[in-house]
């Protein structure tokens, strides 16, 4: 049995390190890396099990340029919504593989802590429960895995929490205090639930690892790149310069635009996301934050 992680960023590297403990696991990316177990894309695609840790915005392009056998088994470990199409990642994969052949990974998990082998709990979601169990069996003992069938809920929670983490970083950057941050996160959870419910996500998903768990982690720590984006926005830094300095992908930025567009099309009330996007477009963080604090819902 051979596994390949597609994507050699921090998260992909962390997954590779964890999975290679008990299995033959390779890692690959578009560009050559000086990494142990690194293989070409062609060699990676010869593996039966593929784990995708690419940027959500680059996923479709990668899938179009590289042939995936429809019999291959896939775990989607990226978290985001494609900005251009407003499609969830599972919808993108459906253009290339049957839904029975992929699962979605979610849950509170900083790459740095996984690489340190610190205790971590993850959720694997898919309609093929046997495949979920198979992927769960690949992980070492320090990673506890749970399985369910709520693919859409896992996708939405994983994407939405990144935007809420930016909002939380803005709140902390403005030194509004712990009370304000707690209010923002809890109201963000309600907003995320409202959005997800429209698309058929299950209620319990929002209170589990992929929902409240991942939201709390991502919205409260400087280990979160999305949270750090919010901190810098609160210092009146321009988004372009923040992202250039970050030198990593902050999925919440593009995802915020996608959620805003979807919410407008479907008539879903998403005040936090709307204000985050307004800040991206030049609105002052002080004005946007005051608007949120005055909301009655």
UniProtKB/Swiss-Prot annotation:
InterPro entries: 6-PGluconate_DH-like_C_sf (IPR008927), 6PGD_dom2 (IPR013328), G3P_DH_NAD-dep (IPR006168), G3P_DH_NAD-dep_C (IPR006109), G3P_DH_NAD-dep_N (IPR011128), NAD(P)-bd_dom_sf (IPR036291). Sn-glycerol 3-phosphate binds at residues 79, 107, 109, 161, 214, 224-226. It comes from the Bacteria. Pathway: Membrane lipid metabolism; glycerophospholipid metabolism. GO terms for cellular component: cytosol. Catalyzes the reduction of the glycolytic intermediate dihydroxyacetone phosphate (DHAP) to sn-glycerol 3-phosphate (G3P), the key precursor for phospholipid synthesis. Belongs to the NAD-dependent glycerol-3-phosphate dehydrogenase family. This is Glycerol-3-phosphate dehydrogenase [NAD(P)+]. It comes from Campylobacter jejuni subsp. doylei (strain ATCC BAA-1458 / RM4099 / 269.97). The gene is gpsA.
């Amino acid at each position: 049995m051979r596994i390949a992680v597609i994507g050699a960023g921090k998260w992909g590297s962390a997954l590779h390190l964890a999975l290679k403990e008990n299995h033959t696991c390779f890692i690959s990316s578009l560009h050559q890396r000086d990494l142990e177990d690194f293989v070409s894309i062609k060699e990676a695609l010869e593996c039966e099990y593929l784990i995708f840790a690419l940027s959500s915005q680059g996923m479709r392009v990668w899938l179009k340029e590289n042939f995936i056998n429809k019999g291959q088994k896939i775990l989607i470990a990226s978290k985001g919504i494609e900005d251009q199409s407003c499609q969830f990642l599972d919808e993108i994969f459906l253009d290339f593989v049957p839904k029975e052949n992929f699962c979605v990974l979610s849950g509170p998990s900083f790459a740095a802590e996984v690489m340190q082998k610190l205790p971590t709990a993850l959720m694997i979601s898919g309609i093929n429960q046997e495949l979920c169990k198979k992927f769960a069996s690949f992980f070492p003992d320090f990673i506890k895995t749970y399985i369910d069938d709520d693919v859409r809920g896992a996708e939405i929670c994983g994407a939405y929490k990144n935007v809420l983490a930016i909002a939380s970083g803005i709140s902390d950057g403005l030194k509004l205090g712990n009370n304000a941050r707690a209010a923002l996160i809890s109201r963000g959870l309600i907003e995320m639930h409202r959005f997800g419910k429209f698309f058929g996500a299950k209620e319990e998903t929002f209170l589990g690892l992929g929902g409240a768990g991942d939201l709390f982690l991502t919205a409260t720590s400087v280990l979160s790149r999305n949270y750090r984006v919010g901190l810098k926005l609160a210092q009146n830094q321009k988004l372009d310069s923040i992202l250039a300095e970050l030198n990593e992908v902050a999925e919440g930025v593009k995802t915020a635009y996608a959620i805003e567009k979807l919410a407008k099309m479907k008539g879903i009330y998403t005040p936090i996301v709307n204000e985050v996007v307004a800040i991206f477009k030049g609105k002052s963080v002080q004005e946007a934050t005051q608007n949120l604090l005055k909301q009655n819902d």
